[in-house]
Swiss-Prot record:
It comes from Borreliella afzelii (strain PKo) (Borrelia afzelii). Belongs to the UvrC family. The gene is uvrC. CDD domains: GIY-YIG_UvrC_Cho. Signal peptide: none annotated. This is UvrABC system protein C. One of its GO terms (cellular component) is excinuclease repair complex.
């Protein structure tokens, strides 16, 4: 590794000092990370000279080559970086995971508006109140508002009255005409409560509460007391900023050990309407992270760009990011940083929201892992899970992937890809493939005295599971690590101790953890197999007269250049339906490639 870094560093010090983008690649020419720089040489040198975080150390351990693209300006570099990241989706760059966020109350923009809970803002002139952290209390208040003020619940118009009309909870706007004035009066009362004007309604509740106690109707008294408490609490939640009436987003980055939390507090007309939590596992520094986030987040198709975007980081050049967002979205937003008393209060709120979001994210995974431990009959929590999948194209270029999840979160530094050697040309045998990859992985762990995972997940059914278990048994570690498989058809979980299999309900947190591991392993294996095939296809297009379609046909029908070698020109011609002259060129190419690589 040191030798590789030394030779890389020698190349780095010869790089230009102009602006541009750089790509860090592994031994298979897979792009691991894409970055941009005002000074390419200086920026890339920093990876070798500075004190590095654990993630960057792991990245540099896997980097075998660095490619650069120079640009005329820093802005061009930013634009290029944005396009390259979207195209290649490197593992070590920012990949956003949406947090659910707290609910808000939406009043629709309709002739007879409806009032309901939502987690999504739609730009259709609807009014929004919130967000509300206590969902239970919000539900109580909404139930009270809908019952008290006869707000419409039905979406469509009808010729007959609805159930709510018969219960006295609706004016009947779904089937009656000309109720606009009466309905608006009811709606204004509901809005008044959501705007925090609750003193009058609290007085009415107090009167009803006293009457209920006098009549010894304690059940109703408890309900009224709960409604009063809920009204007071949600009134306190409505936070209004006095800075201005513009639409402003406040973006805060909260770095964590494995996951970074990015909070966006959205103010519309001076009122907080939404908290959006995003989670990121990239290796980016704080400054790089916020710039990449701003570009990805605000250039996405459905995102509404506010008048101003306030970031809580000093001394960051955001001009290019601002320009790019405005060009792509045709807006006039400003990215700013200010320090005022009001903004510092918003920052405190952003920090507490970030900490809360991270706790929720981690707690969600902890509960799922606890549940998984019980279903899989494990002694310990499956803190470390290693997942395996196999990929091939009709028996060609069979590869395997191994992904690692720590506490339910992808731990990409530990991912591995394997070119499998035990299968014959054209042989499709997932059982044999699983045996090879499990043997290679856990022999390495034993030989290097590395930490075993708590759980191994195999993509497949009983056959693949038994194959993996037989290897673990041969290595004498079958009692040190739990192994299970997940079959795609019915999402059945198989254990060596349970012949029937376990079927959890769709959406169950424990099943979702296993699905995430399985899907990630599947994505990595397929991606690796695709890259291997593309590499071979590209090689064949160097033959005079061979286009991409014929190159793909050679790969599909014959395989690699090694598979071409034993074939005659007639056999090549027959297999891929080309003339003898072209078959001759293909044969000559295979002989030449073999001589170069032996």
């Amino acid at each position: 590794m040191k030798e590789n870094l030394t030779s890389l560093f020698e190349k780095v010090i010869k790089l230009p000092t102009t602006s541009g983008c750089y790509k860090m690649l592994n031994e298979n020419k897979k792009i691991l990370y894409i970055g941009k720089a005002k000074n390419l040489r200086s920026r890339i040198k920093s990876y070798f000279l500075e004190k590095k975080s654990h993630k960057i150390k792991i990245l540099m351990k896997n980097v075998k080559s660095i490619e650069v693209i120079t640009t005329n300006s820093e802005y061009e570099a930013l634009l290029l970086e944005c396009n390259l990241i979207k195209t290649h989706k490197p593992d070590y760059n920012v990949k956003l995971k949406d947090g659910k966020g707290y609910p808000m109350v939406r009043i629709t923009h309709e002739k007879y508006p409806r009032i309901f809970k939502t987690r999504k803002i739609i730009n259709d002139q609807s009014e929004y109140f919130g967000p509300f952290t206590n969902v239970k209390k919000l539900d109580q208040v909404l139930d009270f508002i809908n019952k008290t003020f006869k707000i419409r619940k039905c979406k469509k118009k009808s010729n007959t009255p609805c159930l709510y009309y018969h219960m006295g909870q609706c004016l009947g706007v779904c089937f009656k005409e000309n109720l606009e004035k009466e309905y608006q009066e009811e709606l204004d009362k509901a809005k008044s409560i959501l705007n925090g004007n609750i003193s009058e309604i609290l007085s009415q509740i107090d009167i009803k509460l006293k009457l209920a106690v006098q009549k010894e109707d304690f059940e109703n008294a408890i309900k009224l007391k709960e409604i009063k408490s809920s009204l007071i609490e949600i009134n306190q939640i409505q936070i209004v900023t006095k800075t201005n009436n513009l639409n402003t987003d406040y973006v805060y980055v909260h770095p964590g050990e494995n996951v970074n939390t990015i909070i966006v507090l959205k103010y519309r007309n001076g009122k907080l309407v939404e908290r959006d939590a995003n989670f990121d596992e990239s290796i980016c520094k704080k400054n790089e992270l916020i710039l990449q986030f701003l570009i990805q987040y605000y250039t996405s198709i459905n995102m509404i760009v506010p008048d101003k975007i306030h970031i809580f980081l000093k001394d960051i050049d955001t001009k290019n990011a601002e320009k790019l967002i405005n060009e792509i979205k045709n807006t006039k937003t400003e990215i700013i940083y200010k320090e005022t008393e009001e903004i510092l209060k918003i920052m405190e709120m952003a920090i507490s929201n970030a900490e809360l979001s991270l706790r929720e994210y981690e707690n969600k995974n902890n509960k799922a892992l606890e549940s998984l431990k019980i279903f899989l009959e494990m002694d310990k929590l499956p803190k470390i899970i290693e997942g395996f999948d196999i990929a091939h194209l009709k028996g060609q270029e069979t590869v395997a992937s191994m992904v690692t999840f720590k506490m339910g979160i992808p731990f990409k530094e530990n991912y591995k890809l394997y070119k499998l050697n035990s299968l014959l040309k054209g042989e499709i045998d997932d059982v044999k493939a699983i045996k090879e990859v499990i043997l290679r992985r856990y022999s390495e762990i034993i030989n290097k005295n590395l930490e075993l995972p708590n759980l191994i997940l195999i993509d497949g059914g009983k056959g693949q599971l038994n194959a993996a278990f037989s290897i673990l048994k041969g290595l004498k570690i079958e009692n040190k690590v739990k192994v299970c498989s997940l079959a795609k058809k019915h999402e059945t979980i198989f254990l060596t101790t349970n012949k029937k299999g376990i079927n959890l309900p769709q959406g169950h947190p424990a099943l979702r953890i296993l699905q995430n591991v399985r899907d990630e392993a599947h994505r990595k294996a397929n991606g690796f197999n695709k890259k291997r095939r593309e590499k071979i296809t590209l090689l064949y297009t160097k033959i005079n007269g061979i286009g991409e379609k014929t190159a793909q046909k050679i790969l599909k029908s014959i395989g690699t250049y090694k598979d071409i070698l034993p074939l005659s020109e007639n056999e090549i011609s027959e297999k891929i339906k080309v003339n003898i002259r072209l078959a001759k060129r293909i044969k000559e190419f295979a002989i030449k490639e073999n001589s170069i690589k032996t």
